[in-house]
Amino acid sequence: MNFLAAAGVRRLCAMRAVLPCLWRGKYFSSGNEPAENNTVTPMLRHLIYKIKSTGPITVAEYMKEVLTNPAKGYYMNRDMLGEEGDFITSPEISQMFGELLGIWFISEWIAAGKNAAFQLVELGPGKGTLLGDILRVFSQLGSLLKNCDISLHLVEVSQKLSEIQALTLTEEKVPLERNAESPVYMKGVTKSGIPVSWYRDLQDVPKEYSFYLAHEFFDVLPVHKFQKTPHGWREVLVDIDPQVSDKLRFVLAPCATPAGAFIQNDETRDHVEVCPEAGVVIQELSQRISLTGGAALIADYGHDGTKTDTFRGFCGYRLHDVLTAPGTADLTADVDFSYLRRMSQGKVASLGPVEQQTFLRNMGIDVRLKILLDKTDDPSLRQQLLQGYNMLMNPMKMGERFNFLALVPHQRLHGRNHQTNARQSKPSPSPVAGFGELAWQ
């Protein structure tokens, strides 16, 4: 991604076309926010200084600064998940979500021949709740995994979140090892005795047989936004409003910009979002899986190359204008799963995307719900289970808005096993769990 950052967009002193509110629709206000909402945050001051120095910035650079700037970034020094945060994720809603994902990884491990060891790698683990639910399944199915050497590897840029993850997973029963200068900046041991390590970059995770999990990871990676004009594709930039010195606005670049190379030649939409960083991550995952085996499971808000503008902000569970009070709200964009598949470049087989309600139903969520309901007579617990199920499965909630995509070695789909440390070559599940009913040949 450095080549894009280096290329940048030089200061645009002329031909700045103000971008109309093309995407504001149901997501945003008209742009004429009341003065009291135009909070001059430390991040806004930083961005204004930056734009004055170098000119308008891309939406991708804007997202990156707002979310992950080491000093002022939204993710860097706060807990944005759960009741006190700005959004709740699936693992916070119901234990069934993580339990079924745990079953998925075990299913794929068995299908590949029960390798003697595997790494479970999560990208952006949130509070660690999802991993905690997965590890509980691993413990419950300990007879299957008792001779398998498992280790956890967490890719997390936020120091605040990594501390929360450590508390969730280890309860600090064993003191954590910390080394801020090392690629492995923290190490520990989970409550069940599994070693866990933290990294800032996926490339630092050992290239071994691994299962990868990316739940609501890709939707916060920076996107470049483009508008089709009579002169071709023009990138949407963020600039200072000339009428209000402490307010930002969207403008169109007067000429082509480097990120335009990521737009497909046959693109028919008038507005597109592209995420080169997502492509880099998918290429890395695909390369690793093709060389060392394993699989990747991706779950996120998304579409299959059909949507146009999805860039939006969240603050206190409410939609928030993306240019207002930067640094106080989460910024996100739906994942283009067609782009992710394309960027795997044929190195692995891809399955999906399938809607969350389909994936979870195929994984047996209805059976799991019945088991949990049968185990309790507590009305409040039963209501909590039913509400969680509804949130996960209802098409108007998460059921159709979230999608699942899997990356597996090509040989996985042909029932062949090429893992040197595998204990067996059969049975081979068909089809891959979640993308068809969980069944065995």
Curated annotation (Swiss-Prot):
Catalyzed reactions per annotation: L-arginyl-[protein] + 2 S-adenosyl-L-methionine = N(omega),N(omega)'-dimethyl-L-arginyl-[protein] + 2 S-adenosyl-L-homocysteine + 2 H(+)
Record's keyword terms, sorted: Methyltransferase, Mitochondrion, Transferase, Transit peptide
Compartment list: Mitochondrion
Polar residues bias locations: 418-427
Main location: mitochondrion
Sample GO molecular function, one term: protein-arginine omega-N symmetric methyltransferase activity
InterPro entries, A to Z: NDUFAF7, NDUFAF7_sf, SAM-dependent_MTases_sf
Entry EC number(s): 2.1.1.320
Keyword Cell division appears in the UniProt entry: no
Transit peptide: 1-46
Root EC class: transferase
Highest rank taxon of the organism: Eukaryota
Span list, region Disordered: 415-434
One GO-annotated biological process of the protein: mitochondrial respiratory chain complex I assembly
GO cellular component: mitochondrion
Function: Arginine methyltransferase involved in the assembly or stability of mitochondrial NADH:ubiquinone oxidoreductase complex (complex I). Acts by mediating symmetric dimethylation of 'Arg-118' of NDUFS2 after it assembles into the complex I, stabilizing the early intermediate complex.
Subunit (UniProt): Interacts with NDUFS2.
Entry similarity comment: Belongs to the NDUFAF7 family.
Name of the protein this chain belongs to: Protein arginine methyltransferase NDUFAF7, mitochondrial
Taxonomic source organism: Bos taurus (Bovine)
Gene this protein is translated from: NDUFAF7
